Amino acid sequence: MKRVVVTGMGAITPIGNSIDAFWESVKAGKIGFDRITYFDTADYKCKLAAQVKDFDAAAYMDKKAARRMEQFCQFAVAAAGEAIQDAGLDMEKEDPYRVGCAVGSGIGSLQAMEREHSRLLEKGPSRVAPMLVPLMISNMAAGNVSIAYNLKGKSINVVTACATGTNSIGEAYRTIQYGDADVMIAGGTESSITPIGIAGFSALTALSSSEDPARCSIPFDKDRSGLVMGEGSAIVVLEELEHAKQRGARIYAEVVGYGCSSDAFHITSPAEDGAGAARAMTNAVADACISPEDITYINAHGTSTHHNDLFETRAIKLAFGEHAKNIKINSTKSMVGHLLGAAGAIEFVTCVKELQEGYIHRTVGLQESEEELDLNYCKESYQGDFEYALSNSLGFGGHNASILVKKYAEG
């Protein structure tokens, strides 16, 4: 099968609206948590989120196009534009039918639904906006990215809740592996910090109860109390190796493994024994034809909920046995919160940057873990070369996905 490499990256995040800005913030241990400003939270238990700051859609697309998109699509189009530019990809020189798109969103636009539902109740059904459905549905992220950049190849929208970003990149990887595309623009996007979004997750008792930005999202810490909602987008350019070499592209890393499974257990809780998540990891490692002992770093799903962090720890132990003690594990959600459908994508680009620079970021805010959480969750950052990075995503409904990226080497 074809080899697949990463040649471009773009990001809109709570700690930076470009890959470079995001990465500098990661290395500085910057957190993106603050009081929600999109609406009045006086009646809400949760008052913190990781909002994108200073985003102006008109800086990335013309105003007319921006008005026809909800924010989750604007984030994706902006991040995709950066990724394509970063890759040096000239679409006028490409066969557009060989360039595809796999950009997912876990929810789509809650903003559009809330806005038009209010209009329905106040003014009646005849006043609901005719563009409600195409503005709201999650596949419009892939649709708008394809339209904006003339991508006429395979276009898909994966919706697997919090595993969406990882599944999107994984399915793009498979598409190129199988020879169905030369290039795929892939990733995830989300914008769900809305009244119903926060109320819904709060009703699940999934959100952090902390009002301290420094202690609200603390994966693997004994005092963790829930996730913190984030928003944004991360998009990558994946490319068939020979195609990338022929056009002289810079190669960041190589995607070498992808594994999935289903817990088939519960609609919100991961399986207690971690067997499903473990299988996704072992499938990704087997796909790369390497040994479990070759894995020395995992970017965990690490949501800062009691169950996820405990059960993911069990999954890592199940997948790697005694070797789990030798693996460095961190959670990017300690800085950006949970980006839902974009989470796996932002964590993937984090892995690529870490491989590129030989740097593993710390899990910000981690102080002390309970007894069963006895692995190395990176209280401190690490500097030094390593070859593989494994990124995990676990979604509501029992969706487990792991993707494995390798430091690029010729041969």
Residue ranges and their predicted role:
Residues A42-Q51, G108-A112, S191-S217, G259-R279, ...:
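Active-site-adjacent elements of ketosynthase-type condensing enzymes
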Residues V6, W23, K27-T160, T189-I198, ...:
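Conserved beta-ketoacyl condensing-enzyme motif
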Residues R3-T7, D34, D212-A288, Y297, ...:
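Condensing-enzyme catalytic core mediating Claisen C-C bond formation in acyl metabolism
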Residues A76-A87, A141, S168, E239-L241, ...:
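Short, well-ordered amphipathic alpha-helical segments that serve as non-catalytic structural scaffolds
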